[in-house]
């Protein structure tokens, strides 16, 4: 039996999970010293540790501030996915208050930071939402994303993903990570489901 096409896979999607560094950002990480430490960063680290995650900075993480840049088009796409009834999530190896703030602003459903084993957390999210692996997409860029991508219904690689990731992806974006890749992924899925135009009109209506 032939394997389902990427479009056929996209029609089943109810959840989209994104990596952060290299997917929602261009992969660059800006780190600055924070005199006296950052209470907000400590809060994120403590919450992540409670879920089994580990901080990305080591023991002195609270004395650092991590900054990242996000593309506005990707933010709009995540809002469009929500309007279309598709849940979103992020699973990332690093821990950053910047990511927590961006996720809160975009009303992302699932936020997991400091995660080494992305496949296990991916499985937990599926169980929590009551959906199957075939109904979930994962957007990644590097080899740490492969275990989760191998378990999802639609594995998406960003344009500048590592060759190993592209080789196993069902579909690749036309834009690089941090430069509209998430927008490509959401648009592809919503158009496959015939939900794109309605979501766009609802988005415009919310802001009229």
Annotate each predicted stretch with a short phrase.
Residues 17, 85, 107, 130:
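Conserved functional loop/turn residues at catalytic and ligand-binding sites
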Residues 94-95, 103, 116-117, 160, ...:
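Short beta->alpha linker loops
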Residues 76-102, 112-113, 149:
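Substrate-recognition element of Asp-dependent hydrolases with the DxDx(T/V) motif
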Residues 4-7, 102, 130, 163:
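A general structural signal for stabilizing positions within well-ordered secondary structure
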Residues 1-84:
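Active-site neighborhood of HAD-like aspartate-dependent phosphohydrolases
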Residues 35, 64, 71, 110, ...:
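Mg2+-dependent phosphoryl-transfer enzymes with acidic/Ser/Thr/Gly-rich catalytic loops
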Residues 19-21, 27, 94, 141, ...:
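Fold-independent oxyanion-binding glycine-rich loops
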